Amino acid sequence: SKGLYQSFKVSNAEYVPAVFNDLGFPYAFCHHFTTYLVDRPEGFSRAGAEEWETGDRTGLGKDVSVIMVMNEAFSDITDAPAFPYTEENDPLPNLHALRRDPHALSGHVVVPGFAGGTANTEFDVLTGMQTMALSASTTSAMRVVNRNLDSLFRVFGNDGYETSFYHPGDNWFYNRENVYRWFGAEESLFIGDMEAPEYKGRWVTDDYTADLIERAFEEAEAPLFHFTTTIQNHMSYTADKYGPDYEFPPTGIP
């Protein structure tokens, strides 16, 4: 039961290998196996789903490279009244400058979870499907993917684009190594593939990751579709996240 499972003490509840090591493989595996079920929607049929497809349309405009970056745990805190700031101490000046650009389109994304489940947002954005619609118990959409799926990688790839995915974290986490292959990404790059990564605290910096993305764009021999999930802002969010000597910028909060 969920209550019994959560009653056991583990060294790090957020780190899956630690949970399996502390509770033992058979019990942890059997518990997690029950959370990966996908509910069949009422009235669903494969034939009916195929009728929804309207066919591909190509040649509607100039092919341009598309780069998507999902910044780990990012949120526009200036939207929340709990975080006041002065104009001089705007915590997100670059974001706000981009929003004001007359050529920019901006908006808000509502993600399928809070304080966890990073890969669920990746799944929703790339496939157009919704994690929350899979089942009431699914903890991660990535853990139910086990075959090729249509995604933005395939949409762009079928139109002659090079496609790639970068994540400066472990390839096994959320089974990303396999899932992104099933999504259709031609190239996947993880922390084990990166040369001399730069760290800030425990995690690879966004600056280093941005340099990798820029290099991929410059070296592409065809229009590029690229998706990156960063990691610098990953938990934990303690005062020593970036080391004991890190000086935090002023908040502007009275």
Model regions: which residues?
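N-terminal secretory/membrane-targeting segments
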Residues: 1-63, 85-108, 142-146, 150
